[in-house]
Amino acid sequence: MGYNFKETMNKPERFAPGHRMCAGCGATICARNVLRGLHEGDKAVIGCATGCLNVSSFQYPYVAWEDSYIHSAFENASSTMSGVEGAYRALKRKGKIKEDYKFICFGGDGGTYDIGIQSLSGAMERGTNYTYVCYDNGAYMNTGTQRSSATPMYADT
């Protein structure tokens, strides 16, 4: 099956207006496009580490996420989603959940490269069935643009 850009862009928004992200922010564009990869009937559980994307898109009552959403601490988005996906598999196996779900986790470069790599590594080792998206915006943007270990040497963040 080929990719159809027009069809993809006409899909309903799963990352809706109402967030507080900066205009043109890469994390927003990333989240919108990743969610557009889902089929219309797909049910999804979204996990997000504390970071720019979370603090700007999940401020009650202005929630931008149309799917089920879980906020986790900065360093453990992967282990949180690993637990959720494992519980889902167990409940599905017991017949307590009938629907199929997709699991997607977002984390920034600081929360992934610096303090979240052990959680991501553990989830991969356990064979967690989810998609992990690291949006590398070059720094810890929600705390004053400190560099992360993903920031290129001599970059001005």
Language-model features, listed with the residues they occupy:
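Cofactor-binding active-site loop characterized by glycine-rich and histidine/acidic residues
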Residues: 2-132, 140-141, 145-155
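Residues in the short beta-alpha loop(s) of Rossmann-like NAD(P)-binding domains
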Residues: 136
